[in-house]
């Protein structure tokens, strides 16, 4: 069996900690696993309200990829809005990435305008339509109420249903002690990633989550239609957080995707 190096990119509010089951399974079977904390996430000490852009947020991921030897490539795996961070990294370091796996993740082709259809579906699924925003999300206005919010965090009463509706209770309980506010400016940047032709040469895989209450299946299908990946997998009983709700099935999908790479 060939050894692969998987690098995991978390979504909003989460950190490298959310991938612990996948990292453990991969390491137990001879692979490498690196779980990145983006700036202001996980145990990264930065205040998320001070993160100024997507590139600022992604700096730990960029730093990791930049120090890889020229003859080494990794498999990037992202979750939720972490898909935008992964896409940005692919644009900057295409020679370091052998495969990109989007797990219920934002997948938008860089350098293209996001169609209104996708924007509208994204807003509806995430609860960011105007009448739902303050119901589901808490905002911090670090630069004053007259300016855009600096961070966003899901209200505790919605976390179970939106993130972990099919996940074990113990993982949900753990997550509620670790979730952090997420930087708004980073997510605005996801909508405007410059194009990079080399990115299209990186094979992409999408893992759909059938019982996802945040990135609902309709949103996933719209993204797949707009930028079709090489392969698609389905976890029919997974919530938004497949790393908790169906970790073994996701692990098998990762190995299957990795096996498609040339030796």
Curated annotation (Swiss-Prot):
A Pfam family annotated for this UniProt entry: Abhydrolase_6
Pathway: Plant hormone biosynthesis
Catalytic activity: methyl (indol-3-yl)acetate + H2O = (indol-3-yl)acetate + methanol + H(+)
Keyword DNA repair: no
Keywords: Hydrolase
Record family assignment: Belongs to the AB hydrolase superfamily. Methylesterase family.
Protein role: Methylesterase shown to have methyl indole-3-acetic acid (MeIAA) esterase activity in vitro.
Name of this protein: Methylesterase 18
């Amino acid at each position: 069996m060939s050894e692969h190096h998987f690098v995991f990119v978390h979504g909003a509010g989460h950190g490298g900690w959310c991938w612990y089951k996948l990292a453990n399974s991969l390491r137990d079977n001879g692979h490498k696993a690196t779980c990145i904390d983006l700036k202001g996430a996980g145990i990264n000490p930065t205040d998320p309200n001070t993160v100024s852009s997507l590139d600022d947020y992604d700096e730990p991921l960029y730093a990791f990829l930049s120090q890889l030897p020229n003859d080494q490539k990794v498999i990037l795996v992202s979750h939720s809005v972490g898909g935008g961070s992964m896409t940005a990294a692919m644009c900057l370091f295409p020679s370091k990435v052998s495969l990109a796996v989007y797990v219920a993740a934002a997948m938008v082709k860089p350098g293209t305008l996001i169609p209104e259809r996708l924007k509208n579906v994204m807003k509806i699924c995430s609860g960011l339509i105007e009448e739902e925003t303050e119901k589901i999300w808490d905002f911090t206005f670090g630069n004053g109420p007259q300016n855009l919010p600096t961070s966003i965090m899901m209200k505790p009463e919605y976390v179970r249903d939106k993130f972990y509706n099919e996940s074990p209770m113990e993982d949900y309980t753990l997550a509620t002690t670790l979730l952090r506010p997420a930087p708004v400016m980073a997510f605005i940047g996801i909508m405007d990633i410059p194009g990079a032709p080399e990115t299209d040469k990186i094979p992409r895989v999408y893992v759909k989550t059938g019982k996802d209450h945040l990135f609902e299946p309709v949103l996933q299908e719209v993204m797949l239609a707009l930028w079709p990946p090489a392969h698609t997998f389905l976890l029919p009983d997974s919530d938004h957080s497949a790393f908790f709700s169906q970790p073994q099935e996701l692990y098998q999908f990762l190995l299957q995707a990795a096996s498609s790479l040339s030796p």
